[in-house]
UniProtKB/Swiss-Prot annotation:
Signal peptide positions (record): 1-21
Record-linked Gene3D superfamilies: Secretoglobin
One Gene Ontology term, aspect cellular component: cytoplasm
Organism: Oryctolagus cuniculus (Rabbit)
Compartment(s) of residence: Secreted
Superkingdom of the source species: Eukaryota
Protein name according to UniProt: Uteroglobin
Length: 91
């Protein structure tokens, strides 16, 4: 659970950074697959970013932890992320 909260906070910090001109659609796709997709779809969404094996392994470990959460919890984390990103505080 701590990992999921950490991930959500890091994601929101990145997406709401004043330096960001907007949300990278590909990054949003990766996060969606991380939270709601299959391990295979998550791994596929990472390929274009060319992570090294250590990064891929870490991402897959995180995916396993997140997949252990109930589906509704993961859906609500995604909704929370979307709500915060669309907030006037992040624009």
């Amino acid at each position: 659970m701590k990992l999921a909260i950490t991930l959500a906070l890091v994601t929101l910090a990145l997406l709401c950074s004043p330096a960001s001109a907007g949300i990278c659609p590909r990054f949003a796709h990766v996060i969606e697959n991380l939270l709601l997709g299959t391990p295979s779809s998550y791994e596929t969404s990472l390929k274009e970013f060319e992570p090294d094996d250590t990064m891929k392994d870490a991402g897959m470990q995180m995916k396993k932890v997140l997949d252990s959460l109930p589906q509704t919890t993961r859906e609500n984390i995604m909704k929370l992320t979307e709500k915060i990103v669309k907030s006037p505080l992040c624009m």
